[in-house]
Structures are given as C-alpha cells and as structure tokens.
C-alpha cells in the first residue's frame, strides 16, 4: 500500500457535461471532508457543494467514496463528479492540491496502483489503455476480453502446465534410484508436446490480437506494371503514388496508413520485382524484399492480361520460393476491366484469389473485406484478446526455450537442462501478466497511459 495520495482528472480534458476528479490514497476521506464539509458514507452518491479554503462554492455535484480494499486501486478512492468545464476542473484540482500530502498523479498511476495492489494483472491494466484507444468495434471487444481476464487465463493455464511438468521432471532428477525412468516413460515427452502445441495456439491468437491493436502490415508486390501503385491509390483513396505505363516508375517504398471500418492497416507499395541493371532500381528492389520479409500479408499483384494462371507457383515460382513460410499471401489478378473476368474473391484454392481492377476500383471492396477478415474482423464474433509487441516477444522466447528443452530430452535425456529450460519459459510467461517484471518495464508500460487512469 502506498503512503501518498494522488489526484487527477479522470475524464478527457475539454468541455463536457460532466467532469470527474479522482483521488486515491490514505488522505482520500480527508480530502472529501475538506472539499465537501461532510464525512461521506461509503458507496453512497451524495449531491454536495464543493468549496474552496474560504468556504466559497466552486461547484456542486456528486461525491462518491470507496474505502480500501474495495475500490479500483485497492486504496481509499474519492470521486468528485462536477460540471465538465476545464476552468471548473482546474479550480477543483488546485483546491485539492492545497491539502498537505496530496500530489498530482503521474500518467497511468491509478492503474499502476491497481496492479501493485493485486486488483488486476498487467495484461488487464494494459487492456484499459487499449479499450480507450480502440479504433473499431472489434478492437474494443478484444480489449474488453483482455480486461475481463481472457488473455491472463490462457497464460495462467500454460504456467500451471509448466509447473506440473517441472515438478515431475525435477522429481525424476532428485530420485534417480527409482526403478522407473520417469524421463523415458513417455509422459514427460507427451506433456511437453501438449504444452508446446497449446503455446502455439496462444501465439496465433496473440498475433491476431496484436494486428488488431497495432495494424496489419500489407505489402503490395509483383512485377513492374502489374498495377501495384494503382492499387495503393485505390485503397488509400488518394493519389499517393505516380502511375504511368512506363515499367519501373516506382523505385522506392511508398507507405500509407489507412483504416478500414476503424481497423488499422499499413499499406506499402514496392518497386516492381525483376532483374534490373539500373543501380537505383536495384536498390528499390532490395528495399522491396526487406519490406516483404517483414510483412503480415503480401498482396501478389498479377497483370491479368499477361497470364491466365491463378496459382503463384505457376505464375512466378521463384518469387514464392523466396517468401518466408509464415507470411500470408493473397493473389490479386488485376485489370479485370480488360480481361472480362468475374470480379470478387475466390476461396476455392489456396492462397485466396481476388479479381479486380485497380484502375476503375471494381472489386476493391472485396479486397477491403478480405483484409478486414485477415485482421480478425467478424461481425458475429465477440473478439479474441488484445495483445502487444512485448507479449509476442515473451511468447516467442518461451517457445524457443521449450523447443530447446524438447531437443535435450529427445536427444540426450538431459533432465537437468530440460528443467532449466522449463523454468526460463515459465519466467517469460510470467512477464506477460506481471508476476515477474522489472520496475523499468512497469514504468514504461504505465507511463503510456492517460493521466487519471
């Protein structure tokens, strides 16, 4: 429990019908008595005047007192709900700061105190900021799932499985004289594989949650003059790229940040891929491949007037072979206005095929819908959980150590090394929920929150 008392405006700054001042700490009840002249009953909304040090009324509104530990922060909490004008809010905060022992809250300090007082774990605290920042209904649903503990529950299940397996492995190490070789009886190997599979499932869902929060990186790639720049312009709704009939017009990477129904996308147009002799064009092609390797999804642009093929392996096998295995690919057969092909999306074969005309805009709506679905949008789902880059990094490191442990078990029956790898993997998972986190990490996370949250 902290010993100082903090105050901040909990509602957004600016004019509004209602503005809320939040106070948390051991002096919250004293602040209530000083500002309202009353001893507040816990959990009762009371309509009272808010006065200055001379007893002059500054405002009037509702006062609510929540004694610890049954409050958002786990401390004594006072909320003053007054009129939402910035001058009124500023006068009230200045009045409260006149009380000895009260200071302004740092950004995110209320949520930080809630975390430190075990009112929520770190993923739930982060979900508050994600819910506030949500740019789409789906993102809000995902953030709410995390706030309600869905992500934490998945992590805790993995940690419990790791703990049980560690106990079993360490028992086998500590009692080698037992007639049964516990490491070789198949249970350890089977349980470890189950944990690895479950972790992989959580990683897939976390990747989707991170895309929902941070945006999906989509790279438009293909041969020169396939219509890549025209597609960038069609998706962004403006003439971001120069479009000509001259092959190789785009020589550098062009970026546009767009939203499709509130869902963020980073669209990147790249230089046409070919064997170039021009030094500048070569640099552009190298940069194109750098972007492709970092993409969440590649839109493989094909000039429909040059081939009837729809399978990337048939169209350009060398391109497909150079793609990283984990990157999704969508084939875009462009210039449907010239070929007369039926517009729209085809899911019959893998990868997904979309026929459109970037020049006229026909079929582009089908691509927009497809990109939304790739980001996890579904009108009839409640949404998965929200994830951040640090979550993905921790999950990846945990998976790496489990893989090392599995290799040591299967190759050498090295129980001691397996036990250590399990311990490290568990530590990385605990970083996600904050059960093992450095002060520096906590400071960076909560400093990104709004003041008053």
From Swiss-Prot:
| Cellular compartment(s) | Cytoplasm
Q: Which cysteines are joined by disulfide bonds?
A: none
GO CC terms, sorted:
cytoplasm; cytosol
The entry lists its GO molecular-function terms as:
GTP binding; GTPase activity; metal ion binding
Q: Per its UniProt record, what InterPro entries does this chain match?
A: G_TrmE, GTP-bd, GTP-bd_TrmE_N, GTPase_MnmE, MnmE_dom2, MnmE_helical, P-loop_NTPase, Small_GTP-bd
The answer to whether keyword Plastid applies is: no
PANTHER family per UniProt: TRNA MODIFICATION GTPASE GTPBP3 (PTHR42714), TRNA MODIFICATION GTPASE GTPBP3, MITOCHONDRIAL (PTHR42714:SF2)
Annotated residues that bind GTP are located at 225-230, 244-250, 269-272, 334-337
Which E.C. number(s) belong to this protein? Answer: 3.6.-.-
According to the record's subunit comment, the protein's assembly and interactions are: Homodimer. Heterotetramer of two MnmE and two MnmG subunits.
Q: Sum up the protein's function in the record's words.
A: Exhibits a very high intrinsic GTPase hydrolysis rate. Involved in the addition of a carboxymethylaminomethyl (cmnm) group at the wobble position (U34) of certain tRNAs, forming tRNA-cmnm(5)s(2)U34.
What is any Pfam family matched here?
Answer: MMR_HSR1
Q: What is this protein called?
A: tRNA modification GTPase MnmE
Q: Does the keyword Transport apply?
A: no
Species per Swiss-Prot/TrEMBL record = Vibrio cholerae serotype O1 (strain ATCC 39315 / El Tor Inaba N16961)
Q: Which cofactors does this gene product need?
A: K(+)
What family does this belong to? Answer: Belongs to the TRAFAC class TrmE-Era-EngA-EngB-Septin-like GTPase superfamily. TrmE GTPase family.
GO terms of biological process kind? tRNA methylation; tRNA wobble uridine modification
Give the binding site residues for K(+).
225, 244, 246, 249
Leading EC class: hydrolase
